[in-house]
């Protein structure tokens, strides 16, 4: 084999490797610009071989059924500077022999491409991009996405909708409590590619639709308007222009405001607006000639990693954080970066003293993407993750990728974080009681557990707070007034405020809606009657976490002490006028649009009574896929049977 052939093979192997990391595993190790550079090098060595490559992604994941795309899901050509955009516009003008062409500009969402098929208005299939020609079947998972249309009114024949699935930055921060995911795209990919759709249903997936195949629209702008009318989520940021200046103006406007968006974008997509002209332009084997992705300049910088320190969170998870020599990235001074977990440190071989490349994306904490091993001194040791908690000295426990301190009642860091969570905006929202004040009161032994907050006024009668810097009569009065005003709270916020592991806002709301009152919830949990939670589809992790929490006598005492100072409002229901009020309902089979637990919660909120067995008193059987023997029995008993679509319309 010649040196040139060896180089070609090496480049091809590198490209294939990075294709799998990006498209299948959603764990890219290099930037888009570096990836494009590999492709350019291969093209320079053997243009013809490169031009005949078929793949535009990665092979489909073997765990999923395969779906062949009737029209390939091609990738887009990229540009990284204004010259690339100008070249694209000039090229299509020459091809079409036109002086002016209307271009639609849209943000490029940093998510996962999907395709959804509808037959006579009914949602029947969803697939990932895969290699562009064959994708993975993710129908049941896409069906769980909140607000995703399952039926389109007045649509006949086959219609295909394409778009991008993502997780918002705010949802990502809530979801990633245990630092399981590196970024929102990674979280979205992991959520969409679950073999169990019930897991996907609990993840905050969202989507934007941008393409319609099988419609009668004449332009891309009409396509977006049609998608909106059909009930799909469409990105509001878009602009029509016929000039290079207009294209660049939109790029600059979005570039400047991108950090105000609650989702990641990595550039702008330019599309020829006229669909007839798109068809005339056609495509190469990899990308349509009618579109271009103008990627944002990578927001990277190199700096030195001084030290890796460990933070202990509310649930005891130990998270490594990099302390950096401060560096300016995109106008922001960065001095810390997330290292996620010990597996991430090992995979990238990150060591204290390394020169590292930092990437800043959106509002997510900056990340280390690469180590400059050439700058590393020979005697720099590997980082050893601690086997004891740096805050309390307890032996840690390994749980998957997470390392946890088990001493939740004795570890100062965990107690302080729990107190911070309890008073946070989405929980009790006590103004004036932030991290600084909590640590201050903790060190003075005035607040050592949650109930102490509500007896702080009593304790301060025997303590001269005004002697301490920053505290005067007014600030003390304001704090005590803020605490007093938060003695009445809704059940869902109360459950969320406790900081129980895996109980976020969504699960807290599900529990509140199911149990309706605090007494119902407390009595059920403290009597170990959490089997119901598992049946409802809230999940094994949540059920086990609740069991663990209520098995601790100190938690039971804390709840009893705390609730003595509070009024916890039951869930109000406007179910009296509901069609389902006082109706007895039984569920059977698999539901596609929501988990069984969510369906039962919705039914209870509407006033229905849920039963696990059929009888002549049953009003409705809600039948999903593979309903089993209950379906036959319902027919024998004369019970009215509703399919999932009918059920969705009711609730």
Curated annotation (Swiss-Prot):
<dbReference type="InterPro" id="IPR041663">
    <property type="entry name" value="DisA/LigA_HHH"/>
</dbReference>
<keyword id="KW-0436">Ligase</keyword>
<dbReference type="InterPro" id="IPR001679">
    <property type="entry name" value="DNA_ligase"/>
</dbReference>
<dbReference type="Pfam" id="PF22745">
    <property type="entry name" value="Nlig-Ia"/>
</dbReference>
<feature type="binding site">
    <location>
        <position position="164"/>
    </location>
    <ligand>
        <name>NAD(+)</name>
    </ligand>
</feature>
<dbReference type="Pfam" id="PF00533">
    <property type="entry name" value="BRCT"/>
</dbReference>
<feature type="binding site">
    <location>
        <position position="411"/>
    </location>
    <ligand>
        <name>Zn(2+)</name>
    </ligand>
</feature>
<dbReference type="Pfam" id="PF03120">
    <property type="entry name" value="DNA_ligase_OB"/>
</dbReference>
<keyword id="KW-0227">DNA damage</keyword>
<feature type="binding site">
    <location>
        <begin position="32"/>
        <end position="36"/>
    </location>
    <ligand>
        <name>NAD(+)</name>
    </ligand>
</feature>
<keyword id="KW-0235">DNA replication</keyword>
<feature type="binding site">
    <location>
        <position position="295"/>
    </location>
    <ligand>
        <name>NAD(+)</name>
    </ligand>
</feature>
<dbReference type="InterPro" id="IPR012340">
    <property type="entry name" value="NA-bd_OB-fold"/>
</dbReference>
<keyword id="KW-0464">Manganese</keyword>
<feature type="binding site">
    <location>
        <position position="106"/>
    </location>
    <ligand>
        <name>NAD(+)</name>
    </ligand>
</feature>
<dbReference type="GO" id="GO:0003911">
    <property type="term" value="F:DNA ligase (NAD+) activity"/>
</dbReference>
<feature type="binding site">
    <location>
        <position position="405"/>
    </location>
    <ligand>
        <name>Zn(2+)</name>
    </ligand>
</feature>
<feature type="active site" description="N6-AMP-lysine intermediate">
    <location>
        <position position="108"/>
    </location>
</feature>
<dbReference type="InterPro" id="IPR033136">
    <property type="entry name" value="DNA_ligase_CS"/>
</dbReference>
<feature type="binding site">
    <location>
        <position position="392"/>
    </location>
    <ligand>
        <name>Zn(2+)</name>
    </ligand>
</feature>
<protein>
    <recommendedName>
        <fullName>DNA ligase</fullName>
        <ecNumber>6.5.1.2</ecNumber>
    </recommendedName>
</protein>
<dbReference type="InterPro" id="IPR018239">
    <property type="entry name" value="DNA_ligase_AS"/>
</dbReference>
<keyword id="KW-0460">Magnesium</keyword>
<dbReference type="GO" id="GO:0006260">
    <property type="term" value="P:DNA replication"/>
</dbReference>
<feature type="binding site">
    <location>
        <position position="271"/>
    </location>
    <ligand>
        <name>NAD(+)</name>
    </ligand>
</feature>
<comment type="similarity">
    <text>Belongs to the NAD-dependent DNA ligase family. LigA subfamily.</text>
</comment>
<dbReference type="Pfam" id="PF01653">
    <property type="entry name" value="DNA_ligase_aden"/>
</dbReference>
<dbReference type="GO" id="GO:0046872">
    <property type="term" value="F:metal ion binding"/>
</dbReference>
<dbReference type="InterPro" id="IPR010994">
    <property type="entry name" value="RuvA_2-like"/>
</dbReference>
<dbReference type="InterPro" id="IPR013840">
    <property type="entry name" value="DNAligase_N"/>
</dbReference>
<dbReference type="InterPro" id="IPR001357">
    <property type="entry name" value="BRCT_dom"/>
</dbReference>
<keyword id="KW-0234">DNA repair</keyword>
<keyword id="KW-0862">Zinc</keyword>
<feature type="domain" description="BRCT">
    <location>
        <begin position="575"/>
        <end position="651"/>
    </location>
</feature>
<comment type="function">
    <text>DNA ligase that catalyzes the formation of phosphodiester linkages between 5'-phosphoryl and 3'-hydroxyl groups in double-stranded DNA using NAD as a coenzyme and as the energy source for the reaction. It is essential for DNA replication and repair of damaged DNA.</text>
</comment>
<dbReference type="InterPro" id="IPR036420">
    <property type="entry name" value="BRCT_dom_sf"/>
</dbReference>
<dbReference type="Pfam" id="PF12826">
    <property type="entry name" value="HHH_2"/>
</dbReference>
<feature type="binding site">
    <location>
        <position position="389"/>
    </location>
    <ligand>
        <name>Zn(2+)</name>
    </ligand>
</feature>
<keyword id="KW-0479">Metal-binding</keyword>
<dbReference type="GO" id="GO:0006281">
    <property type="term" value="P:DNA repair"/>
</dbReference>
<dbReference type="GO" id="GO:0005829">
    <property type="term" value="C:cytosol"/>
</dbReference>
<dbReference type="InterPro" id="IPR004150">
    <property type="entry name" value="NAD_DNA_ligase_OB"/>
</dbReference>
